[in-house]
Regions:
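Conserved CoA-thioester-binding segment of acyl-CoA-metabolizing enzymes
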Residues: 1-56
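Amphipathic alpha-helical interaction surfaces in cytosolic regulatory modules
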Residues: 56-64
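Short glycine-rich anion-binding loops that position phosphate/pyrophosphate groups of nucleotides
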Residues: 55-57, 99-100
């Protein structure tokens, strides 16, 4: 899965899972992240979310290979960049940053 979703008690752990691409945001990751946040928001048993990255980098920002190939759709209409930045939420999400959060990766952190 490009975005992993786990429940741990009252906490949802949402993990960016593209370590081979430094968790760079592609259109597929953006859609999956928006869906994971929606799942968290709709579960009344969950109180807080944690956004993490798999591997040595939290998130390298935009997937530049996708952009170079002409696929610059790195967000969603509702969630903005990464399917997350402008997504309205009613519950807190904490960024668990281990490793670099570069460019758009930093934007994801700031949106938490």
């Amino acid at each position: 899965m490009i975005v992993e979703y786990e429940k741990d008690g009252r906490v949802a752990v949402i993990t960016l899972n593209r370590p081979e691409a430094r968790n760079a945001v592609s259109g597929e990751l953006a859609q999956a992240l928006e869906e994971a946040v929606d799942r968290f928001e709709n579960d009344d048993d969950l109180w807080v979310g944690v956004l993490a990255g798999n591997g040595p980098v939290f998130c390298a920002g935009a997937d530049l290979k996708a952009v170079a190939s002409g696929n610059a759709n790195l967000g969603t209409s509702r969630g903005g960049f990464g399917g997350f930045v402008t997504l309205e939420r009613t519950k807190p999400i904490i960024a668990a940053v281990e490793g670099p959060a570069v460019a758009g990766g930093c934007e994801l952190v700031l949106a938490c």
